[in-house]
Amino acid sequence: MKAMIRRSGVGLSIYMSKKDVEEPVVAVENEDLWGGFILVRNGWLLGLPDLPQGTRLPITVEAMKQPDQD
């Protein structure tokens, strides 16, 4: 799904237009953000594309929602 990632005064947030949801990012797998997973406050685990380190924000990317784990 298309997602816009931006940095605010309190950290990273992600907006998913298809769901009309904006949530803060609570955890990142990779320090440079790209090519790993992020955990969103609503519990979604999203895979991000592998982009160069230093990619400027805000940016719209194709994020992949991981299946729910029980």
Swiss-Prot record:
This is Protein FixU. The keyword Membrane does not apply. Keywords: Nitrogen fixation, Plasmid. To K.pneumoniae and A.vinelandii NifT proteins and to the N-terminal of R.meliloti MosB protein. It holds the Pfam family NifT. SUPFAM superfamilies: NifT/FixU-like (SSF159203). One of its GO terms (biological process) is nitrogen fixation.
